[in-house]
From Swiss-Prot:
CDD domains: C2
Pfam families found in the cross-reference section: C2
Region (Disordered): 228-263, 821-842, 931-985
The keyword Coiled coil is assigned to this record: yes
Compositional bias annotation for Polar residues: 946-956, 972-985
Segments forming domain C2: 263-398
Entry protein name: Coiled-coil domain-containing protein 33
Organism: Mus musculus
Coiled coil region boundaries: 599-745, 885-928
InterPro entries to which the protein is assigned, alphabetical: C2_dom, C2_domain_sf, CCD33
Keywords from the UniProt entry: Coiled coil
A GO cellular-component term linked to this record: peroxisome
SUPFAM superfamilies: C2 domain (Calcium/lipid-binding domain, CaLB)
A Gene Ontology biological process term: spermatogenesis
Amino acid sequence: MAFRGPDPYLPASLLSQRLKAGEKTLDLEFEILSVGFNEEGRYALRLSAENPLQAGSSAGVQLQVNDGDPLPACSAVTEVIEQQDPGQSLTFTRNKFIFTLPKGFCKNDGQSDAHLRVEALRLDGSSGQEAQRVGEAIFPIYPRPDEPRMNLTAQDHEDLYRYCGNLALLRASEDPTARHCGGLAYSVAFHVHRDPRSSVSDCQLEPSQPELQTSREALSDKIEESYMSPFSTDSDQEGLSWEAGPWQHPAQVPEEPQGRLDTSQDPYPAANYLAPCNKETITVTLYGATNLPAGKDGSEPWPYVVVKTTSEKANKHSPQAMTSVTSEPTRAPVWGDTVNVEIQAEDTGREDLILKVMDNKRKKELVSYDIPIKYLRIFHPYQFKLEKVFLRGVNEPLVNSLKPMVVIARVVPNYTEFKARQARRDPASVGLPLTQVSFPISSPMNFDVPRINQNGYPQLSKPGGPPEQPLWNQSFLFQARDGATSFSENTALVLEYYPSASMQSSEPWALNQPLGVSVLPLKSRLYHKMLTGKHLQGLQVERLPIMRPENFLTPNNSKALPTINPKILDENLGAIRESWSMSSLDSAQEVEELQPRDVEMNNYRRAMQKMAEDILALKKQANILEEENGMLRSHLSQQSIEEQSRAEEENLAVSMKQKLLLNELDMKRLRDRVQHLQNELIRKNDREKELLLLYQAQQPQAAQLRRYQDKLQKMKALEDTVRHQEKVIEKMEQILEERLCERKEPIPSNRPQGKPIMASGIPLGPMGETLAVDLYSMLLAENTRLRTELEKNRQQSAPIILQQQALPVDPRELGAGGDLAERLQDTNGPGHPKSTETLPAQVGVPGGYSTAQAAPGAPAVHKPKINIWSSGGMRTQDFLGGTSDKFNLLAKLEQAQSRILSLENQLEESARHWAREKQNLAIRLQEQQHGFGQPPNSIIIDQPNAGASKNPQQLSKLEPSLPSSDKKLNRPSDSQIEISNNQKT
């Protein structure tokens, strides 16, 4: 099959727009129409919804089987069916599975592969053996192949796809010689999740299809439960152990718990093995229980059992069936009661059978068990011939038997081998093998029954009483494909007798050592006698030998009983009295009447025997023909499977080619991508090398740039210093202007007569004369000229940064509240470099004298010093060297500073002289006011303070205050003191 590409009517780009599967909850309806296997055996199918490309994809998947309720599961198992003829089509009852897939299970991203896995399981041997996986098939859910096409534009009420097809169950075993398992026909539908709709399924089977329907092998339309033992967790309870038991006759169920049933009544009860129309009947035989929980006060309960269904529990209806109450309180009751429960046929897939053990005294539930009815296997009577064994009782009284007895009946296909297994103490051949079921029930395989069991299918009777001569009056039904198959040379009916009190032992139902055993060989002669009996009412056998008479029967009859030797049994079997009716034939008259008929009956018997032999021969021939037909059908099915396998191989080859093409395209795209990335990597490496070379070339430039930046920072610091000095000069100019203003003030008119005229703030000469006003004007002009030259020099490329000699300042004004400190605060702020200090200028005179040693009248010259700091440390450099103009300006500036300092010294001396004169004048004035006259040439050395003490306010008024500028000039700065100390050291 060639690949045709995507749908031409719907582009691939619109696929995600039309169908957003990852955003929807989807339903997959998968119905198995028929199935066929290539080999005989018992098979089951397991269906699982998977998405292996997504981790944890099974979470959120819900599964609905037939019309049951949705359950959180992604896998389900059908019931077990038996393939008798290879190639024959079989059907399942659990055949419709609805998988609800959550959002994100199916996606359009190409990373999703949702499919349904169908596995074929083969069950051989006992029910405890693990199932063998012999075949599997994969059904793609989403995305789908081209055929059949999906309806990508479907609405919510429409199906994405719906069709019927076939799946081949391919070989799953590692054995290379194993062939394909078989195939199945299915019907599938895929759509958006819809609300569940109520539907009623037809559970009735047509007579033309006699199939086993569920997973529990029982008889007729009824199922039978045997001994029940409550499971024990922490409340001293045991697990439920049960095995197939005998079929009981329907018992009337009272509304309330009844008393102990009489097992000896109704020796020939009428049994009905057919269920009513459209209903299913479940027959439950409750034998006993052990380890029931006691009451809170430690008292023992009065137990009885209530049997109901889940619908009755939900609707709170009264129970249909319940057992009798024990005669006394006990934790290990024995009931032996049989009850019937009827349900609708369409509800078998949804109903559960609930067994509740109640306490009659406290009306409380002791234990409860739920058994799904869909796990049980149903027999239809029109499909099979059933063998019925009716056990009446013991003919003679027993000795040393104080307790009721139970009987285990089984039909073994080979009694010789069965006896050998019993001698070897094989657990499966001794007693009653029990199957322990844990609740809640996890798998229906616990209810499965093997097709052939060499130990037979044991069935348990009710306890028979009285103990001296027990009577059971109970029937046992055994399945057979036809009447003659259960009668052969080695087949035998085995009856084992056990005490019923064994269930109260430490190990419940430990039936290891029987009290006695009876064996009835089921040979073909016995079968012929059953067919030729009067009115076909069966063969009645009395005085059947019982083994171990020394422990079982009375001593009087023990010697006369035969042994279990088969030869002796064959000899005595001809002497067994056969009764064709319930009445006795001891009357001689009846014997005479029957003699003519016996001759005729013998003729009929011979004819019937011949017919039976002919029938057996024809059956053998029919079996041979069936085998040949089966072989032909298997060959035909093998050919069809091979054709299907070839078609599948072609499809697989096409899909593999498509995947290979896609992989090649991906490889090519990845190869181009790798080449592109390699080119990019080469370009990146080249660019990296260029950047490294550029970085290495820029290293010297970066170092030079850092040096220039350092120089620029130093220049900025020097500029800040110059600005700081300019501010100081401005302050000095303001002081000088104030002095000039004070000198130009008019002389007050109220001065005392004879007092010399003195300008405030103008120093006097040595003889009391005032200095010329032109001196201050000259200083102002000189300062203006110097400021103009500084502005010109600042505009040049290499700024001249000078540091002016700090003026002497009064220490009191350098404090926190000093005037000069406030004025200089902005010049020494955060912007001013902390590393720059003002060094005092060296004041000298011509001839090398210092300021202190200067000759009188010689002007003091102050030489400023320029400090420049670099990264290597502090060094002194004169930036004015090399240019004559700079030297001239520096000389002029130095001269101006020396002039300023000399004038300041003169002002200081004048202020001091004026203060002394003022003090003398004040003293003289006080003397004159007090009448103390002194000669004009007298000199006062010590002036008394009496007048001052008498009138301190007047003295304070007369005492003039020095200008603040004078005081400030007398105070040296801290920087001068610090740098002077450094120079001395």
